[in-house]
Amino acid sequence: MTTQQTIKVQLIRSPIGCQESHRATVRGLGLRKIRSTSELVDTPEVRGMINKISYLIKVL
């Protein structure tokens, strides 16, 4: 069995006032409220989303 690597991210800043695409990216990562966390599979797509909104989140 292969185990997939995961990345845990936490929303630390509100996406209010940000670009619509950045808000959609936050929702796409499964984050809703401030301090909410989401555990995601480590893929290039997810890393790109994290890089796009790095000023809003923290990688745990």
Swiss-Prot record:
GO terms for biological process: translation. GO terms for cellular component: cytosolic large ribosomal subunit. Gene3D superfamilies: Ribosomal protein L30, ferredoxin-like fold domain. InterPro entries: Ribo_uL30_ferredoxin-like_sf, Ribosomal_uL30_bac-type, Ribosomal_uL30_ferredoxin-like. It comes from the Bacteria. Keywords: Ribonucleoprotein, Ribosomal protein. CDD domains: Ribosomal_L30. GO terms for molecular function: structural constituent of ribosome. PANTHER family: LARGE RIBOSOMAL SUBUNIT PROTEIN UL30M, MITOCHONDRIAL RIBOSOMAL PROTEIN L30. Belongs to the universal ribosomal protein uL30 family. NCBIfam families: rpmD_bact (TIGR01308). Part of the 50S ribosomal subunit. This is Large ribosomal subunit protein uL30. It comes from Albidiferax ferrireducens (strain ATCC BAA-621 / DSM 15236 / T118) (Rhodoferax ferrireducens). The gene is rpmD.
